[in-house]
Amino acid sequence: MSGVAGHAEVVGGGIGGLSAAIALGKRGWTVRLHERNDEIRASGSGIYLWDNGLAALDYLGALDSTLVGAHFGARMQTRDAHNALVASSEVNRAGGPRVVTVARERLINALLASADAVGVEVVTGSTVTRVDAAGRIEFDNGHADADLIVVADGIGSRSRDQLGVKTRRRQLNQKCARVLLPREPGMVPSEWVDEYVTFYSGQRFLLYTPCSADLLYLALVCPSDDAPATGDPLPREAWIASFPQLAPLIDRIGPTPRWDEFEMLTLDSWSSGRVAILGDAAHAQPPSLGQGGGCAMLSALGLAHSLSKNYDLTTALGEWESSERSVIQRTQWFSYWLARANKLPDRPRSLLLSAAGHSSLYRNNRMRAALTTPTGITSSK
């Protein structure tokens, strides 16, 4: 077999870590993946899977399981506080961009099944205490040496920080609660019941996402200092005041114990010695484009491909970053600036988003990562 192959230790059981583990396993590596929690499971949210993610999942052997019961909407819409349509774009038409939405748990379970199929050893309840560039990984109860360590344990990764890689985190001063609800008749108007819709009102916005015939994903976003809008239970009155047309929907929201801050993270380098860093640990972005998971999969598959082409690990890691960083970093910045548009007053924001929807330059940049075929595989379109 050409290229580098050996033993890899993967830190983190999210989308990036699982994708890297499977991709390496498919290319002849032995792989052990560590998840600090007692089980690998997703938080109660949905996820958008665009062309890039669908192609990656097909290669990883997880596509069919992921798509069971998935939702294929026809349009992405933006509406204002009065329910007026600001912008709309078609998806899932022949020759156009594809996007499906599923519960994140379904995706994670599909990836776990694929990891098992290629022989990845998954160790839960495994706390990694130290990673070094020479390829040593330490745990509460011992250590191991690896030809490659993949760090994919999230934006707050301690393993990454131990490597001394220069990190920059940009706060957006926005936070988000994510919930899943059963879909019920009459919750929303029939004209957009099956569409993907973002509603704006002041500096609050609400993302409406069907995930299946019977499951709905909502994301509620507001400024970090908007105390009247945050907390557990959700202050429903505050959100209904902003979105009165969504009152039947908001009234059904249950506990909201977790409010995540939106951030963008960049690194000077995605690797150090025998360690590769990917996913939110390397290139976190606000979810404005629904590309956090997609970019993690692009990075993971690109890493495995570069390793398969080069006998030298240092050369392979350098080639990997050169190949993947441009499109991912452009996507990060586009997502960052799109999130910042939420700070605009309603009228200027509506005018901006309406004009952007008619701009081919805007559409091309918005869709850059979504339409990127993962390195090393054939386009599925």
UniProtKB/Swiss-Prot annotation:
List the Gene3D superfamilies.
D-Amino Acid Oxidase, subunit A, domain 2, FAD/NAD(P)-binding domain
Family named by the database record = Belongs to the 3-hydroxybenzoate 6-hydroxylase family.
From the Swiss-Prot or TrEMBL record, what is one GO molecular function term?
A: FAD binding
Its keywords, alphabetically, are: Monooxygenase, NAD, Oxidoreductase, Plasmid
Its function, per the record, reads: Could be involved in the degradation of the Pseudomonas aeruginosa quorum sensing signal molecule HHQ (2-heptyl-4-quinolone) to anthranilic acid. May catalyze the hydroxylation of HHQ to PQS (2-heptyl-3-hydroxy-4-quinolone).
Summarize induction of expression: Up-regulated by PQS.
Instruction: Name one matching Pfam family.
Output: FAD_binding_3
Name by which UniProt lists this protein: Putative 2-heptyl-3-hydroxy-4(1H)-quinolone synthase AqdB1
- Native organism is Rhodococcus erythropolis (Arthrobacter picolinophilus)
- Catalytic reaction equation(s): 2-heptyl-4(1H)-quinolone + NADH + O2 + H(+) = 2-heptyl-3-hydroxy-4(1H)-quinolone + NAD(+) + H2O
